[in-house]
A protein has these predicted regions:
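N-terminal, active-site-proximal structural segment of metallo-dependent hydrolase catalytic domains
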Residues: 6-9, 14-18, 24, 29-87, ...
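Active-site beta-strand/loop signature of hydrolases that rely on acidic residues for catalysis
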Residues: 38-45, 59-81, 138, 158-188, ...
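Stable alpha-helical elements in mature extracytoplasmic
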Residues: 55, 59, 80, 84, ...
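Structured beta-strand-rich core segments of catalytic domains in phosphoester-bond hydrolases
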Residues: 73-153
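Conserved beta strand-loop-helix elements of the APE1-like EEP
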Residues: 103-116, 223-224, 254-270
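Short hydrophobic/aromatic beta-strand or adjacent loop that forms the aromatic wall/cage
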Residues: 103-106, 124-130, 256-261, 288-293
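Active-site beta-strand termini and strand-to-loop segments that position acidic
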Residues: 109-111, 129-134, 265-266, 287, ...
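Metal-dependent phosphoesterases centered on the DNase I-like endonuclease/exonuclease/phosphatase
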Residues: 156-255, 259
Length: 301
């Protein structure tokens, strides 16, 4: 299957002049200046701060202090394009895109113009947002929270969309994948409550997080088989989970686990200089997810 996906990507790229051009993003767009660092921040902000509105001001300050060039956001509940634009202005981003206004929207902001916006709602629980900025195609990811079968279909749809991009495209996948990496399996295997927790969760929510009573690692494996690089894993010194934080200690949230990732195509991963989960006292009380960050240099077009 993964070989087919990679072949399809080449076929789509070659077919651009023959009628697939409407699906391809325009070439020659402005990129970051050579030598400049390019920083991405990805953050699931838990129901758009509707549950804990007092955390919003701290969140805006945190993002501003991080000084990202591009931001991938999940769970922008109750947001409008104007509301996202106001947030983006707080961290000096004049450009922003909201996927939708209902349900659990994703959003994207940038210090540079955003082009090639592609919104896909069909086939995805929360939708898929694709944008281009700084010479990079960025997918804002938020996969299904409670069903491994649906997540697998979403991954396949994501890879089909990826196949429509030019062969040499630099691509990032950033967001809340709601699933597990084989790189973290040794940590999860040592947890006495990981499987029992998901059994409780699936029973409570009528979900399907477990496949045959076990964690399902196939989703991210398919991305890596297609050539994507897990940047956090590549740069980290040890495991850090991105969920849960200390914000919901009164709830049964299960053991810490990594749900938030940034994946890059090899041509972009080669310029990655840093990638990390931002776990500290501040981020522990802003949302139920910790943010993740990646930095690239040189960021050439």
């Amino acid at each position: 299957m993964n070989q087919r996906i990679i072949l399809n990507r080449r076929e789509f790229a070659a077919a651009g002049a023959a009628g697939v051009g409407a699906l391809l993003l325009p070439r020659g767009l402005s990129a970051a200046k050579p030598g400049n660092k390019l920083k991405l921040l990805s953050y699931n902000v838990w129901y758009g701060f509707t549950k804990k509105p007092d955390r919003k001001a701290g969140y805006l300050s945190f993002v501003k202090e991080q000084a990202p060039d591009i931001v991938s956001l999940q769970e922008l509940n109750t947001y409008t394009p104007a509301k996202l634009a106001a947030d983006a202005k707080a961290w000096s981003h004049p450009h922003s895109v909201l996927l939708k206004e209902k349900g659990f929207p994703t959003g994207f902001t940038s210090s540079q113009p955003i082009t090639g916006v592609r919104r896909t709602l069909e086939g995805f629980q929360h939708g898929l947002l694709r944008c281009k900025t700084h010479g990079i195609h960025v997918y804002v990811i938020h996969l299904h929270p409670g069903n491994w079968e649906i997540r697998l279909r979403e991954i396949d749809l994501l890879l089909k969309d990826f196949a429509t991009l030019p062969k040499d495209a630099r691509v990032l996948l950033a967001g809340d994948f709601n699933t597990f990496s084989l790189h973290d399996k040794p940590v999860y295997d040592k947890s006495e409550d990981m499987i029992p927790f998901f059994k409780r969760l699936d029973e409570r929510t009528k979900g399907k997080n477990l496949r045959d009573g076990q964690l399902d690692f196939r989703h991210l494996k398919r991305l890596e088989d297609a050539g994507f690089v897990d940047l956090i894993h590549a740069k980290r010194k040890g495991f850090l989970g991105t969920f849960p934080t200390k914000l919901r200690l009164d709830e049964d949230m299960g053991p810490e686990r990594r749900l938030d990732y940034v994946f890059a195509t090899p041509n972009l991963a080669a310029s990655c200089r840093a990638a990390s989960c931002i776990v500290n006292e501040t981020t522990g009380l802003l949302s139920d997810h910790y943010p993740v960050s990646t930095t690239f240099q040189p960021a050439t077009g």
